[in-house]
């Protein structure tokens, strides 16, 4: 969540900086533009606790097999971006993303089709920005990072939105944001689980989006069509050491709801207490969602989620935290658009959606260490333990993102990341998560992710 806030502020800073050193001609704007890139080699090994199917079948339960099984996948990728220098406050930017999985077998294609498998390239960003004073407008295809509208970058292809975003910092210590989006680009063409695994390709922009928090409600996926979405947000830092954030998201005419609309709410406070040898961190968040007609109401996603977290940082290289979240009875919570919205209790790999269902209580303990303090610059480790209890609904009818029996899930997660000082731009990371889900039966699952990224 803090990254989301920082990214919004970074957009403003970048816009103001570009106008300060603007080009004099269109030719200069392109000549003085900046090229950025990243080369990637990733290896994922995932075991969902289900056997590999004989045939890849689209859709959800009981027949659908996409996203199930036990397989590994090696992928290579490239990101290439370009942004012009500012000319009278205007600049243009574009970002291509490419992915290739040369050794994927049929089991890997079935398992990773919704999120990782698909070869080719996509123009994920193509935008114009305009800065006037302390106001920046950005229109076109773009990556967005905010609490309720968030492009997940945890897979090879980062999600993107076709949108218009307006950011203003005229008020002291305050950032105001407004935005509109009408299309979304997922991780693969099969992010909605609509085709067999071997047919998954690169994604395109569509009038549908991931509605994180709905589980597998629409044909086995959390993807729904919509007719435009609007958002407004504010960040205030007027009180020393305290950051307050609020955001509202309105989604018009959501698919399968007979024209129903979604209203999603977010409020957060982050307080830092500087001490002599460390910092004490106190965080609290509210998430909520409301629906607009009888059809949408029958899905029971008018829930409230309350979260709290207390932690320490910069204690001789150590950081640690304890977090708790709870969701209201028989009503789940929509977390937002895209797979990027998160919660304090989200497991490292599994993500936040398992914490936002109706009747859910979750706890997470996290400990990290920065080896820079002992002379190993760039090396960091992280460990997490997460426990999630979700009870079955006490009402009849559909409750999205619910369970059919009382469920207890535990996650042990770890990460090692190394920014190699001798090879600037090269980062290696290894993540692993072991999970156990217990209801009427016990399912054990695990996932390993290795990433090598070189930025230039």
For each feature predicted by the language model, list its residue ranges.
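Structural detector of coil-to-beta-strand junctions
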Residues: 125, 231, 264-268
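Short, surface-exposed connector motifs at secondary-structure boundaries
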Residues: 240-244
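Outer-membrane beta-barrel pore domains
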Residues: 49-69, 111-115, 245-456
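Surface-exposed coil loops of outer-membrane beta-barrel proteins
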Residues: 52-58, 105-124, 135-239, 250-258, ...
């Amino acid at each position: 969540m803090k990254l989301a806030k920082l990214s919004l502020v970074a957009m403003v800073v970048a816009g103001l900086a570009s106008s300060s050193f603007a080009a004099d001609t269109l030719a200069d704007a392109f000549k003085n533009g900046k090229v950025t890139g990243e080369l990637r080699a990733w290896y994922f090994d995932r075991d969902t606790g289900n056997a590999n199917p004989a045939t890849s079948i689209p859709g959800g339960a009981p027949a659908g097999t996409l996203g199930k099984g036990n397989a590994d996948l090696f992928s290579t990728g490239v990101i290439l971006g370009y942004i012009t220098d500012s000319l009278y406050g205007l600049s243009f930017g574009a970002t291509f993303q490419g992915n290739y999985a040369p050794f994927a077998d049929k089991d890997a294609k079935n398992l990773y089709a919704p999120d990782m498998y698909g070869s080719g390239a996509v123009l994920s960003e193509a935008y114009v920005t305009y800065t006037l004073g302390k106001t920046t407008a950005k229109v076109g295809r773009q990556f967005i990072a905010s609490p309720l509208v968030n492009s997940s970058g945890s897979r090879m292809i980062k999600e993107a939105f076709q949108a218009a975003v307006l950011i203003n910092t005229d008020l002291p210590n305050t950032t105001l944001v407004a935005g509109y989006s009408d299309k979304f680009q997922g991780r693969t063409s099969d992010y909605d689980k609509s085709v067999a695994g071997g047919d998954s390709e690169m994604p395109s922009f569509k009038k549908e989006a991931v509605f994180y928090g709905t589980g597998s409600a629409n044909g086995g996926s959390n993807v729904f069509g919509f007719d435009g979405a609007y958002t407004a947000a504010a960040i205030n830092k007027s009180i020393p050491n305290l950051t307050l954030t609020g955001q509202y998201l309105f989604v018009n005419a959501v698919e399968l709801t007979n024209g129903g609309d979604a209203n999603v709410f977010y409020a957060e406070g982050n307080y830092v207490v500087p001490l002599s040898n460390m910092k004490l961190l106190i965080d609290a968040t509210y998430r909520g969602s409301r629906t607009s007609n009888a059809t949408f109401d029958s899905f029971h996603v008018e829930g409230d989620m309350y979260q709290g977290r207390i932690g320490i940082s910069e204690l001789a290289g150590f950081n640690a935290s304890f977090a708790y979240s709870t969701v209201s009875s028989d009503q789940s919570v929509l977390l937002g658009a895209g797979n990027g919205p998160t919660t304090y209790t989200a497991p490292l790999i599994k993500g936040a959606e398992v914490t936002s269902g109706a009747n859910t209580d979750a706890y997470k303990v996290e400990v990290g260490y920065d080896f820079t303090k002992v002379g190993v610059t760039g090396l960091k480790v992280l460990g997490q333990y997460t426990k999630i209890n979700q009870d079955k609904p006490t009402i009849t009818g559909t409750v999205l993102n619910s369970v059919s029996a009382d469920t207890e899930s535990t996650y042990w997660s770890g990460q090692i990341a190394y920014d190699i000082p001798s090879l600037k731009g090269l980062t290696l990371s290894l993540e692993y998560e072991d999970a156990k889900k217990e209801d009427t039966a016990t399912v054990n699952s695990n996932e390993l992710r290795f990433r090598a990224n070189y930025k230039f």
